[in-house]
Amino acid sequence: MTKSSKDICSENEGKKNGKSGFFSTSFKYVLSACIASFIFGYQVSVLNTIKNFIVVEFEWCKGEKDRLNCSNNTIQSSFLLASVFIGAVLGCGFSGYLVQFGRRLSLLIIYNFFFLVSILTSITHHFHTILFARLLSGFGIGLVTVSVPMYISEMTHKDKKGAYGVMHQLFITFGIFVAVMLGLAMGEGPKADSTEPLTSFAKLWWRLMFLFPSVISLIGILALVVFFKEETPYFLFEKGRIEESKNILKKIYETDNVDEPLNAIKEAVEQNESAKKNSLSLLSALKIPSYRYVIILGCLLSGLQQFTGINVLVSNSNELYKEFLDSHLITILSVVMTAVNFLMTFPAIYIVEKLGRKTLLLWGCVGVLVAYLPTAIANEINRNSNFVKILSIVATFVMIISFAVSYGPVLWIYLHEMFPSEIKDSAASLASLVNWVCAIIVVFPSDIIIKKSPSILFIVFSVMSILTFFFIFFFIKETKGGEIGTSPYITMEERQKHMTKSVV
């Protein structure tokens, strides 16, 4: 079919203005970073699939009638589940420092780190060594939490930051899905009342599953070393490499006219440099009401995400489903759940720029409430009825879908759009750290609470989703389409007032 002159003119105008399709140059750069997001999701989920095999091989319930359910296993499993999140807190705290040396360099360090840690985890033989290895895995995840969204934010067209930002969450869910799929090779898992030892294949396979991220890390290293050697335009400009910054912007915007984004970066860098000269550190910013306000909002928004209960479902779903299902259905349902989580993240790529960040966050809270509240009430009335068991399972899927298209991907986009450039690195790191601290608070006791009464979790998550809805409705502002380094919470005049005053 021959194109009309009008169509050709329209295409040329699009190129001139730097408008291109989703699968543009930026897409390739984003993919190179999202390999780390995949490792993130895989590392969070892998233990959920293979935990019982480790319990049997390490004999945590030795001498007990039930080799899977004993007090020693409950305590050690809780520590093992929480160790990743504790490590992530430490990683987030360090990530703000690491990204100062380069966004691409940060990713390269992360891939090398995961390569070594995955090997270490696969050769552990004791509780203390596997606990240490999982802490290190969590540390790497904490680095990913800040580095990848920052890289994506600085390597993409301003009108597509949301869509590309969703890819971080998409690859996290893909990693979760792959971890569960690989676990299928071992079957249903060891029986609690059996004395039969693990097969040689099972003993080998769970270690290979821990080793798998090292292979993915090598792919990430290869991508950055061979194909994607450039740093982000913001970082390059900040280091005085103006022409390099301009050249990479031409690739990102697919046009020679990049004056507008270059000027936006210039203004952001100047504000950041002024902040450094005037010693506007995170602690200094917290003393200024306008900056303190946006930092607190970011930390609250980040922490509240964990009270949707998403990491309880991801890291401990097998334990939760034991309350409702026979063992032969648990693995199948976990696979379906992770597949839904992965697939339902795709719509967010397209709707995050159409509906905006705030609208998606609000609808996500409504979805979580609709999922949990009826389930909590039904569990209190008659926990053992088949209807309540089915309702509980359906609720987890409604929650997963709601999270996948809203709070999951949107938070990491928002944290790198809400803060002004002079505090973005440190404030985003702090907010991410708060997210992982809240994950520990939620995940650590979940194993014990599930055994006592799952409805307690449903009630807590229901109440928190209501509080989160009103918090977002009244306090959170839209950031869609904003220039890099700006903030809807602090005017340029307010920022300049603090940037231009003399150092005392």
Curated annotation (Swiss-Prot):
Biological processes per GO annotation: hexose transmembrane transport; monosaccharide transmembrane transport
Assigned keywords, A-Z: Cell membrane, Disulfide bond, Membrane, Sugar transport, Transmembrane, Transmembrane helix, Transport
Effect on the protein upon substituting I310A: Reduces D-glucose and D-fructose transport activity
InterPro entries: GLUT, MFS_dom, MFS_sugar_transport-like, MFS_trans_sf, Sugar/inositol_transpt, Sugar_transporter_CS
Annotated phenotype, changing W412A: Reduces D-fructose transport with no significant effect on D-glucose uptake
Chief place where the protein resides: membrane
Reported effect, W436A: Reduces D-glucose and D-fructose transport activity
Effect caused by changing Q305A: Reduces D-glucose and D-fructose transport activity
Keyword hit for Transport: yes
Outcome of substituting A439N: Reduces D-glucose and D-fructose transport activity
Positions with a binding annotation for alpha-D-glucose: Q169, Q305, Q306, N311, W412
Subcellular location field: Cell membrane
PANTHER family per record: FACILITATED GLUCOSE TRANSPORTER PROTEIN 1, SOLUTE CARRIER FAMILY 2
The protein, known as: Hexose transporter 1
Species of origin: Plasmodium falciparum (isolate 3D7)
Source lineage: Eukaryota, Sar, Alveolata, Apicomplexa, Aconoidasida
